[in-house]
Amino acid sequence: MRVIAKFGGTSLGSGDRINRAADSIARTVEAGHEVAVVASAMGSTTDDLLGEIAFEAAASDRAEIVSMGERTSVRMLKAALSARGIEAMFLEPGAELWPIVTNDLGEVDVPETRARAETPAAQLERVVPVITGFLAENQAGEITTLGRGGSDTTAVMLGSYTDADQVVIVTDVEGVMTGDPRVVEGAQNVGRISVDELRNLSFRGAEVVAPSALSYKSNGLAVRVVHYQHGDLLSGGTDIEGEFENIIDMQEASLSCPPVAAPSLPTSPGILAALSQVLRAAGITIDAVSTRMDPLTSYLTESRPTAPENLRPSNCAAARP
């Protein structure tokens, strides 16, 4: 079985925890499995480094500075694996085998990254690559970052692009819980959860798996969350089931977009209900609504233009109950 194991900052937060992580990796390799490791910065290193930048730094310089957390982690973990007789190598941006590339927009260059991931994947039978999470490089070879939760994204992305069987997210909680165990007494582990359910929890503040990572989850890729104290990469925790589905609804049909403008209109109580009543009376369906400080724009499925006088703020105000 091919496994991508991602160790978060807490699970690598001390020498003892690095030893625990190395032991779990070594046991998995010795059981005959192929393992690639993604490592976050130790503990709060990234936040500490960011906090010490008390000057105006270019984005490229900031990326270089914060990358030192992950760069240290992969060296520590690689050394711990070597001490256990496991053939390992660390990979960081700039290395010949580095896989993750971003484009001019700072987004992952999917075709390039997918192609590059094939090379380290082909070596998994004989070596364990320990890869810096969160980091990438652009076409010019400069370090870039994948944003908050970027190590989760690194792991699930590489799991998808290397045809892994399973991605294991090693963190400081026993998988997904019924509540925050630091706050809710008696919180229990949820054995299984769907991608959609976990994504909704993530958008509401649950810090389990980054939403950006879930976008790379497919039905053929198992993803599991386990506690670093568990010590076993192949059991326990919470299984994340299903496949990511894009929640953006794309339509090719033409839409009318009449704006309604007045000072502080979107914050006026009852304005949306009033607008809806005016349009319903005209037999027009609202497809979506967009608000800013002053204008309120409706996207209408009706192909013919709406008479402007019908959408005057005074008419909308008159329609309020």
Question: What are these language model-derived features?
Answer:
Residues 1-213:
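Nucleotide/pyrophosphate-binding catalytic subdomain
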Residues 3, 127, 165-166, 199, ...:
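Structural beta-strand/beta-sheet cores of well-ordered domains, especially the beta-sheet scaffolds
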Residues 235-321:
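A conserved regulatory-domain signal marking ACT and ACT-like small-molecule sensing domains
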